[in-house]
Amino acid sequence: MPDLHIGGFQFVIHSVVPLFSSPPDRPSTAFSSPPAGAAADEMPVNVRLLPLRDATPPASRTLFESPVWSMTADGDMRRIEMRGRGCAEPYWVAQFQLPFRRVDVYFGPGQLTADGELMSPLSYPLDQLLLMYLLAEAGGMLMHAAGGVKTGGAVYAGPSGAGKTTLTRRLLAEGCEMFSDDRIIVRPWAGGLWLFGTPWPGDANVAANRCAPLARIHVLQKSGEDRDEPLAPAEALTKIIPCCSLPWFDPPVLEQSLQGLNRILQDVPHSILHFTKEAAQN
C-alpha cells in the first residue's frame, strides 16, 4: 500500500509486514500521489503499523465510546480502539500525541489476509478521525459537501438528502470539474484557502485527487427556483456547522476546529444556493 495524500497531508506508511495492494478501481488508489493543482508542500504524517500485542492499555479518561469504536485520553495522548460487536480483541488500536506528526496503528490478526498481507487500517472511521485532528490544528475542516471548480473553487455544503449528488451531476453535465460529491476538505494552504477532493465519494462516485483555491461556500437548499441568497456570517455558522465533521467528544480540539471554521467564514463569501433538479448555478 503506497502513501496516502489527502487534504495537503502525506500519510507516510511504515509497516512491519507486507501490505495488501488495493484494487485499482478503489477511490483511495487515486490518492497515492500529491493532488493535481498542488501549490505547496504537503505536511508528512508518519504512520507506523505494528502488531496488536505491542499496544499499550487504554488511557484513563474516556472521551467517546460506542459498540464499534472508542477513544480514551491521558493528557495530550489520544487512543482510538476499533472492534466488532462481541469481539474479544480490537481490530486495531491507534495512538498519537497532540499536536501529532506520527500515529502508531496496532493491527490484530484479523486484519491479515491468508497470504499474511495487512489490510489497510487507514479506512473509516480512522482516516476521518485522524484528519479531524490534523485539520483542527491547521485551521481547516472536513465538510459534508460537494465541491469543484467552474468559474472558481466552490463548496456546496449540505447534510444527506440536501441534493449534493443531484447538483454534482448537473454541474458535471455543464462542464464543471468536480472533486467530490460528498466530502470536501477546506483549509488554509499556500497563502490562501483551498478546497481538496477526498477518497470518500457519494452516489455520483466522484472522488478526484485535486485541489484549487476556494472562492465561495454555498449551503444547499432544494427549491422551486434557482437563486443565490446572501448569508450573514452569524447565520452561516449555524447553517454550516451541521455539515462539518467535528470532534464533539474532545472539547479542546473542538474549540480549535470551531475557531478555524469561523476564520474560514470570515475570509470566504458564503450564501444559500436555492436550486431545482433541472438547473444549477455557481
Residues of each region from the PLM?
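Post-Walker A alpha-helix
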Residues: 167-168
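Conserved glycine(s) of the Walker
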Residues: 162-164
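A noncatalytic interaction/capping subdomain that flanks phosphate/NTP-handling catalytic cores
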Residues: 1-160, 173-177, 184-282
